[in-house]
């Protein structure tokens, strides 16, 4: 079958080649080459009109930098790692995270704009609404640029990107994820978030979708789950499973495993177990086997009366009997059921998940699973009451903490907690990034998860400081404009994300009153909201510095922001006591040569451009030090010829 599109492309390219022969000047050749490149562009899969952003233009002439906000810092426990909220365009932040966290992130969770047509997100400082004919192209351009940078952060051996979306863009998002992550395994989960449905002219929307992009060996972890995960209200099997010794199904015939067709012998009068006899020769029928005098022989027969085989050997069965892991039912009409505990069940006993509460007369263990919570991975449809966006973990929680409705459509705390739990239950020190942070649910969920299992997961959230449409209108009517202090005060980073984070860690609302109620843990227990969480968090703001300054050295400008990069990369606070940054000789004298500070120093970072004497280097080596990583701004300095 002819590829008509390819034939047409080849014809156009051949025509361009002929034009090149008659128009050989540089301008014409350059124009022809651009036309040819466009003709050869991808013509299949997800194709859209790519749009540029103002931030792209800013990146060409400027370098993103971070500056700590000294008024927004919360230390609850100095022994714990630090978390970070970064205010700024997420393209800026991802550029910097690519320098501090390349290949180090375990989980990225994002809840991007759903592009519903409402005025809920901006492209180049303008709201994108339903009347914009390029709204899908703008959304895809915005997402692709960020996903490409985010991909660079993920641990290639084992990590996951989770992206939530609804029906407006899920088809395009799925194609985009396949394009950006061609080697990943991608799965979509449906999550019920509105049991009553969102009213519309079509079917009411009750759910949204979570894309899981599994990188490397990443996979969801089987974890204990409560009954709310059972849509039909029934329990998952929690009883101790004694496996029947009779094999069924594939390879279950005697002819398949002739060595496993052997008799189990019992005392005829008492039913006492006597042991096993040798396998019956294949040419001898089981019916012709004659047991020892006074014994009953139990041979493996299928339910249809045909000769079958056992699952395990006589030797293995006796080994299990010696530890109480082999059992049988009372003999009735010359029949009994042999059973044993498989390795998985024995492991649960060893771990204390099952309890041995006694032994039967035949020596078999009596095992209780009363306190055991089975571990499993759910299916792709989640109907969990706590995942409701308008419930106690969603908008109601936001209003309780912030006292007013400062944010529309927050995710349920428990939906995010459960999502992160499936991917990081086996990673208590995971690094989690959310670069569409919004109301700050992700960090809240990380704190709750850490409180549940004692983990030290770290979270980096990125959000801009946009005000809502209504707030912008009110502020403009009062004469305020973007960048005014009064305007910035009501931006989402400062008005929602930060205060929610502080309140939830400290256990009070924005008025200072203790939070009422409890958090429900994954296993159904409760944690008082007023107890808060043990966590530390810093607030950074993205800024710019020119790539080629005229009146000063770029290296001097960048040195002012190295501290934040080191803190972000290492989840620490550079306090110049415990963690020390040496940018010049004065820093060296104030710390390394300070008899009061030196004994407290644990880690040191040094500017490579400082020339130290032999004695000074010796003092540094005694403590141990690292040079400021070249990957921070080495490329930018080379471009500036520094």
Where are these regions (language model features)?
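DnaQ-like (DEDDh/DEDDy) 3′-5′ exonuclease domain used for proofreading
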Residues: 1-109, 117-139, 145, 157, ...
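Carboxylate/His-rich catalytic cores and anion/metal-binding grooves
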Residues: 41-57, 87-116, 120-121, 334-384
């Amino acid at each position: 079958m002819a590829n008509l599109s390819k034939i047409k492309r080849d014809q156009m390219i051949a025509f361009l080649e002929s034009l090149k022969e008659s128009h050989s000047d540089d301008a014409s050749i350059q124009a022809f080459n651009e036309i040819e490149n466009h003709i050869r562009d991808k013509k299949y899969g997800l194709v859209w009109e790519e749009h540029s952003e103002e931030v792209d233009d800013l990146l060409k002439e400027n370098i993103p930098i971070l500056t700590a906000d000294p008024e927004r810092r919360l230390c609850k426990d100095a022994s714990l790692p630090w978390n970070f909220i970064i205010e700024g365009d997420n393209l800026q932040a991802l550029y910097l995270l690519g320098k501090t966290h390349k290949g180090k992130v375990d989980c990225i969770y994002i809840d991007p704009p759903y592009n519903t047509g409402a005025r809920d997100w901006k492209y180049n400082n303008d709201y994108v609404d339903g009347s914009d004919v390029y709204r899908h192209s703008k959304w895809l351009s915005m997402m692709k640029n960020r996903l490409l940078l985010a991909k660079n952060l993920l641990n290639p051996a084992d990590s996951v990107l989770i992206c939530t979306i609804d029906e407006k863009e899920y088809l395009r998002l799925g194609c985009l994820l396949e394009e950006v992550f061609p080697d990943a395994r991608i799965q979509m989960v449906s999550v019920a978030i509105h049991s009553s449905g969102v009213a519309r002219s079509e079917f009411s929307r009750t759910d949204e979708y979570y894309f899981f992009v599994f990188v490397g060996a990443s996979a969801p972890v089987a974890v204990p789950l409560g009954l709310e995960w059972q849509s039909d209200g029934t329990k998952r099997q929690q009883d101790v499973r004694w496996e029947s010794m009779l094999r069924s199904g594939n390879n279950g015939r005697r002819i398949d495993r002739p060595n496993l067709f052997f008799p189990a012998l019992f005392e005829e009068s008492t039913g006492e177990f006597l042991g096993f006899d040798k396998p019956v020769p294949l040419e001898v029928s089981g019916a012709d086997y004659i047991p020892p005098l006074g014994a009953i022989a139990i041979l493996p027969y299928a339910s249809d009366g045909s000769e079958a085989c056992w699952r395990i050997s006589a030797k293995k069965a006796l080994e299990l009997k010696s530890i109480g892991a082999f059992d049988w039912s009372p003999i009735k009409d010359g029949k009994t059921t042999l059973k044993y505990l498989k390795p998985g069940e024995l492991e649960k006993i060893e771990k204390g998940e099952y309890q041995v509460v006694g032994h039967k007369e035949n020596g078999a263990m009596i095992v209780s699973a009363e306190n055991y919570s089975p571990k499993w991975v759910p299916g792709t449809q989640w109907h969990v009451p706590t995942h409701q966006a308008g419930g106690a973990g969603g908008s109601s929680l936001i209003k309780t903490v912030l006292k007013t409705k400062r944010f529309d459509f927050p995710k349920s705390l428990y939906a995010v907690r459960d999502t992160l739990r499936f991917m990081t239950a086996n990673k208590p020190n995971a690094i989690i990034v959310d670069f569409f942070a919004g109301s700050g649910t992700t960090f809240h969920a990380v704190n709750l998860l850490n409180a549940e299992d004692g983990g030290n997961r770290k979270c980096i959230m990125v959000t801009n400081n946009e005000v809502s449409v209504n707030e912008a209108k009110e502020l403009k009517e009062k004469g305020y404009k973007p960048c005014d202090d009064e305007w910035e005060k009501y931006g989402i980073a400062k008005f929602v994300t930060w205060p929610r984070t502080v309140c939830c860690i400290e256990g009070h609302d924005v008025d200072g009153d203790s939070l009422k109620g409890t958090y429900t843990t994954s296993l159904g227990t409760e944690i008082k909201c007023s107890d808060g969480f043990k966590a530390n968090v810093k607030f950074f703001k993205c800024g710019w510095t020119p790539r080629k300054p005229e009146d000063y050295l770029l290296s001097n400008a960048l040195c002012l922001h190295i501290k934040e990069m080191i803190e972000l990369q290492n989840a620490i606070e550079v306090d110049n006591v415990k963690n020390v940054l040496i940018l010049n000789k004065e820093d060296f004298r104030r710390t390394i040569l300070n008899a009061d500070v030196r004994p407290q120093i644990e880690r040191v970072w040094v500017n490579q451009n400082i020339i130290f004497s032999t004695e000074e280097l010796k003092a540094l080596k005694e403590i141990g030090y690292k040079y400021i990583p070249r990957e921070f701004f080495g490329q930018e300095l080379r471009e500036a010829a520094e």
